[in-house]
């Protein structure tokens, strides 16, 4: 089985995440795309939305998308979980013969700091979702998915703009954001 793993904080999920999934399904020859929200991100200090909330929102956004599954593997660890361990788990679970690992272009700069990165590079083919406004010489070494949507979860955490939130969860995000401000 050929799989793609798309890990991230998804805090909150936005239309660029949806576009990445759509493009991956179109361009990668895969049987399944597994979205893996983190419990803790080793490169971020805190979260806007709790892990279980992010998991449920992802399920809501992608529930009708064929070949897509949302994994709660890292969330269930309830601690920092490294991509190396997640890849091993999913490789065994799906008996994967080919694994693509999708990540946003902003993560390329920290890739050399990832836990067991050299071993991970032997296990997966990294696929980078490009992003408007980010430039990196490191991109030439990777397959890319061109996504021309200039939005980030960081931006949305400071100022919710519903035009960037998937329609399936707009109301949820507005209610959650309102609760954060009260």
From Swiss-Prot:
<comment type="similarity">
    <text>Belongs to the NadD family.</text>
</comment>
<keyword id="KW-0808">Transferase</keyword>
<keyword id="KW-0547">Nucleotide-binding</keyword>
<dbReference type="Pfam" id="PF01467">
    <property type="entry name" value="CTP_transf_like"/>
</dbReference>
<dbReference type="GO" id="GO:0009435">
    <property type="term" value="P:NAD biosynthetic process"/>
</dbReference>
<dbReference type="GO" id="GO:0005524">
    <property type="term" value="F:ATP binding"/>
</dbReference>
<dbReference type="GO" id="GO:0004515">
    <property type="term" value="F:nicotinate-nucleotide adenylyltransferase activity"/>
</dbReference>
<keyword id="KW-0520">NAD</keyword>
<comment type="pathway">
    <text>Cofactor biosynthesis; NAD(+) biosynthesis; deamido-NAD(+) from nicotinate D-ribonucleotide: step 1/1.</text>
</comment>
<keyword id="KW-0662">Pyridine nucleotide biosynthesis</keyword>
<dbReference type="InterPro" id="IPR014729">
    <property type="entry name" value="Rossmann-like_a/b/a_fold"/>
</dbReference>
<comment type="function">
    <text>Catalyzes the reversible adenylation of nicotinate mononucleotide (NaMN) to nicotinic acid adenine dinucleotide (NaAD).</text>
</comment>
<dbReference type="InterPro" id="IPR005248">
    <property type="entry name" value="NadD/NMNAT"/>
</dbReference>
<keyword id="KW-0548">Nucleotidyltransferase</keyword>
<keyword id="KW-0067">ATP-binding</keyword>
<protein>
    <recommendedName>
        <fullName>Probable nicotinate-nucleotide adenylyltransferase</fullName>
        <ecNumber>2.7.7.18</ecNumber>
    </recommendedName>
</protein>
<dbReference type="InterPro" id="IPR004821">
    <property type="entry name" value="Cyt_trans-like"/>
</dbReference>
């Amino acid at each position: 089985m050929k799989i793609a793993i798309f890990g991230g904080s998804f805090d909150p999920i936005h239309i660029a995440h949806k576009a990445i999934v759509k493009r991956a399904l179109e361009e990668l020859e895969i049987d399944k795309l597994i979205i893996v929200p983190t419990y803790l991100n080793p490169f971020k200090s805190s979260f806007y939305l709790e892990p279980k909330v992010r998991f449920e929102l992802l399920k809501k956004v992608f529930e009708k998308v064929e070949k897509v599954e949302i994994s709660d593997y890292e969330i269930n660890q309830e601690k920092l979980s490294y991509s190396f361990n997640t890849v091993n788990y999913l490789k065994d679970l799906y008996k994967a013969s080919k694994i693509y690992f999708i990540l946003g272009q902003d993560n390329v700069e920290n890739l050399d700091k990832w836990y067991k990165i050299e071993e991970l590079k032997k296990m997966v083919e990294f696929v980078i979702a490009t992003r408007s406004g980010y430039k990196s010489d490191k991109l030439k070494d990777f397959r890319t998915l061109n996504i021309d949507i200039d939005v980030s979860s960081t931006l949305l955490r400071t100022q919710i703009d519903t035009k960037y939130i998937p329609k399936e969860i707009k109301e949820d995000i507005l209610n959650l954001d309102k609760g954060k401000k009260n």
